[in-house]
């Protein structure tokens, strides 16, 4: 109950491993660290646990009437859309937080390596969710 405003930018990148995101994955705990932490659960379930735990802590340290700003994104896992922004809204509301508004940051899509036909929509935006703590 200390801060009037808390910002929370959790990991929402489902893919970990080799590549240019290695350092980011390591810092966010979504590389080998997430693999070790998840045990028998899927990578997505373990990542969702991190998001839920982080939002819970952000709300705990925010004083009543204060705001939690939470950034979320969408991704593709196994050809299926993963809606981390929806998970965060549900989690916050289940905790008693009020969603004041959501803001979308649209970005210009980057060219992607050709891996065959596009099977899923490109979600080239991030969501900022503004919660109020009761």
Task: Please give the residue ranges for each predicted region.
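Class I S-adenosyl-L-methionine-dependent methyltransferase catalytic core
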Residues: 1-134
């Amino acid at each position: 109950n200390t801060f009037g405003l808390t910002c929370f930018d959790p990991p929402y990148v489902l893919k970990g491993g080799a590549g240019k995101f290695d350092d980011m994955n390591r810092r966010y705990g979504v590389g080998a660290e997430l693999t070790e932490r998840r045990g028998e659960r899927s990578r997505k379930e373990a990542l969702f646990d991190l998001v839920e735990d982080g939002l819970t802590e952000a709300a705990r340290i925010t004083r009543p009437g204060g705001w939690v700003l939470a950034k979320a994104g969408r991704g593709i896992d196994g050809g299926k859309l993963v809606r981390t922004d929806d998970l965060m809204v549900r989690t916050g509301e289940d905790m008693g937080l009020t969603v004041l508004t959501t803001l979308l940051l649209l970005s210009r899509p980057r060219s992607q390596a050709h891996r065959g036909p596009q099977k899923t929509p490109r979600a080239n935006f991030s969501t900022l969710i503004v919660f109020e703590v009761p």
